[in-house]
Design a protein with these regions (language model features):
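Glycine-rich, basic loop-to-helix element that forms the pyrophosphate-binding segment
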Residues: 59-76
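A conserved acidic beta->alpha catalytic loop
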Residues: 25, 34-44
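Active-site donor/metal-binding and catalytic loop motifs
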Residues: 184-204, 215-216
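Non-catalytic, C-terminal membrane-associated alpha-helical segments of glycosyltransferases
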Residues: 207-215, 226-281
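A short, conserved alpha-helix in the catalytic core of glycosyltransferases
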Residues: 139, 144-147, 151-156, 161-189
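Short, well-formed alpha-helical segments that are part of the catalytic scaffolds
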Residues: 10-28
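Short aromatic/hydrophobic "clamp" motif used to bind/position activated sugar donors
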Residues: 81
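Conserved donor NDP-sugar-binding/catalytic core segment of glycosyltransferases
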Residues: 89-123
């Protein structure tokens, strides 16, 4: 087992401000493929100029996180694919320790995630097992996932109905249902700066709020009992409506607007519409 058996896959969208710091932090793995969802020819030229060994593909339309990562996973020629967000930085020895953990687990895992103190790992309390280096958990955040393609053959990849958010939870849920394992490697460290992988300002916030709610309702529809699903999400619609009224009365136009986007995302998902909203850029 060596570094050549791992491919790093990165999906970008208006990510020029962060992607180079991410790539600079990758010291050992040279199989790197990028799919840019904003068809940025200049970014491609800059990346290839600095890192000639990287393969970068441009998409003429914004495919979303899940679809784009599925393309990268399918394009990779290795058993293991390390999915990274462009605003993630690998700390010293992250790759070395991940490789060591793959060997320790004897490749018997579906997902292995490096550790970030800001991450949550489902219902796992990290303080109960402070000395354990490999922690089995319910789910991990999708900003850094080392995926074992051999295990994914029976599970499937990211749900392509989801444009943004909850792809990671959905995948981990299906892994758990398939009686496969998700681990966190506490010896491998990353820094994820969060919500900095794109630089389109308020348009990103509108898109983020819309898809956060759409994906939340979609996720609930997949995994909650019928009556619980409708009770929970009808209450969500009422709550968002009241918040819009509240912020409108307070003349806080920005918060009222973002709540409107949340309401639209939740409503569209509840009535069965696809995740159609895209940022206007």
């Amino acid at each position: 087992m060596n570094y050549s058996e791992i491919t790093i896959g990165i999906v970008t969208f208006r990510s020029e401000k962060v992607i180079f710091e991410c790539l600079d932090s990758i010291k050992k793995i040279k199989n790197i493929i990028i799919l840019d969802n904003s068809f940025d020819k200049l970014l491609k030229k800059k990346i290839i100029s600095k890192y000639p060994y990287i393969k970068i593909f441009l998409s003429k339309k914004n495919l979303g996180y899940g679809v784009a990562n599925n393309i990268l996973i399918k394009k990779s020629k290795t058993q293991f694919v390390f999915i990274l967000s462009p605003d993630v930085i690998l700390e010293k020895n992250c790759e070395k320790n991940l490789l060591s953990s793959i060997k320790k687990l004897k490749k018997n895992f579906a997902i292995l995630s490096p550790d970030d103190q800001k991450m949550t790992y489902g219902y796992f309390d990290r303080t109960k097992f402070p000395r354990k280096k490999l922690l089995k958990c319910d789910f991990v955040v999708g900003s850094a996932l080392l995926i074992n393609k051999n295990k994914m053959k029976k599970i499937g990849l990211f749900d392509e109905n989801i444009f943004l958010y909850y792809e990671d939870r959905d995948l981990c849920k299906r892994i758990k249902f398939a009686n496969e394992n998700v681990y966190v490697d506490k010896t491998s460290k990353i820094n994820h700066f969060g919500a900095k992988s794109t630089n389109i300002g308020s348009e990103f916030e509108k898109c983020r709020n819309w898809h956060l709610m759409w994906s939340s309702v979609y996720f609930d529809r997949k995994y909650l009992f019928f009556l619980i699903f409708y009770a929970k999400n009808l209450f969500l619609l009422l709550s968002l409506t009241l918040r819009i009224i509240f912020y409108t009365v307070l003349l806080d136009k920005k918060k009222a607007m973002y709540k409107q986007f949340r309401l639209s995302g939740a409503y569209n998902s509840l009535i069965g519409n696809s995740s159609w909203y895209r940022p206007k850029i």
